[in-house]
Amino acid sequence: MLGFLSRGPSMKLCMGLACVLSLWNTVSGIKGEAKKEKGMTFLPTTVSGLREEERKEKGVAFLATTELPARSIDLSALNLTELVNGMLSRALKDSKKFFSLLSVTSYSSFAFHKFSVAVYNISNLKTVDPAKFPTRYCYCLNNRTNDLSDFTALLVDIIGNSTSYLTEIFKSTSILSVNQSNESDCIFICVMTGKSGRNLSDFWEIEEKYPIINYTFTSGLSGVLGAATRGTARTSKPTTKSQKTLPSTSPGHWTQSTPWASALRSSPWTETAAPSETEETLNTGRPPELPARATATWFSASHTLPALATRRVARTQWLTADRQTWASISSVPWAQTISEKKPGGSLWETRSSPPTTAGTEEAMNTTSLLAPAAEIMATPGSPSQASPTLGAFTHGTQTPSPTKATAPRYPQTGDLSAEWPFTAGEEPVLVPRPHQVSRCPQPLFKVGAMAAAPLTLAIQRLNPCLMELCQFFQQCLCMSQRSPRTEDMRYCLEYYSWFLKNATYICQRVKRVSHSHTLKQKCLENICKSV
């Protein structure tokens, strides 16, 4: 029967048509599915690409138009301790060579749009014009003073006495160079300040120069460099950085740290005074590390940096000769060095302050991160002798580049080494703050303790405490900086009695200078008003 049906012409025609239709449907289905899959894969790509471009355009437009007032910038968030120590530990790991340059740049006048930290190994740096970068501050690191936890305060203090608000740090370029000399056990981290443009050709030779480590932070709101600054490490050469610095003279290696207690010394660092000012400003001790937004100093297992540093700052003199040479750096322990700029010239003279006498005015500089200030006067003390002049640094000496240093990430809590040194008597702060220790110890406030101590020791003990008080005031009592977060409120409430006791004591001990216009001393005035 089936054979009969298959032999009929009409049936053959129907079977042929059915096969053709079936084949056509199959081909159409395959093409349709392929087209559908292609559309499915293409659509998300197009949408995500458009969204990404749109997001970038909005970000660029925001950064181009937004102007944040300087007073809204929270400088307590500008604590680069963790970043700098991370870079140091990684750059120096398995290497005895030292990098030459740490550059901190920003090109925004009143808004904090971009903040870059780059580490360069410089060997082809041009001569730096002293007229553009006239001021130089140095910080001594050795086996007794190898800590960078006051790095933030150092940056702020450099700029702090030049403007009502700390906008200068955002429109100037601060360059840090690292120098080590055989004549001294110090590794000098020196900072030059000045104004420059974005053109690298002013300072660099034609050859391309790539940073060893480069971090760039961008800020959209007033959070600036707080907890959200987990910046992405970039390895490409920055095209908008102005690089000027002092070259290091010899490759130095990081000196090993001594036991924790051996780092309890403190020495002053220089302050630039205007020619009309006659008072000598003494700055000793360390900046505050109260735990609101300041980051703790994390330690690498191979390079432990003690956290109580001594400061020694030097001033250098620019010499113009056939070869530009950095003149000798005067390091003055326990005394103040003031460098004055000659009104008509670009040369900067270096001089040590005379020994302190009973009639000498000595003021402690307090590092206030955005908090207002007034100079404080300390009781005159015994004369101080200046140390001998250190050897000169010759411009142009080439520093060998360190071994391969990867861009560091922010260390987490698990990266802490076993050498994190805290004693049982020290009081930690509230979780989740970094583990910090107050620098206002109880023995400081015993009756007669300060009167019996020499001037330098008294200032050494008072100054770190005062800076902690300044930071507490900014974070807890300053209305514009007050944080609504629960942990911040708990911290402020719990430590207010500590603030009140220590602030009352310090305000009784010191005397404010009303005509002072420096940023760093305005904090004391507000603290004393609050108590």
Curated annotation (Swiss-Prot):
UniProt key word Signal: yes
Compartments it resides in: Secreted
Residues that carry a glycan: 79, 143, 161
Sequence segments annotated as region (Disordered): 231-289, 340-362
InterPro entries associated with the record: HHLA1
Polar residues composition bias: residue spans: 232-269, 349-362
Principal cellular location given in the protein's record: secreted
Annotated keywords: Glycoprotein, Secreted, Signal
Descriptive protein name: HERV-H LTR-associating protein 1
Annotated source species: Homo sapiens
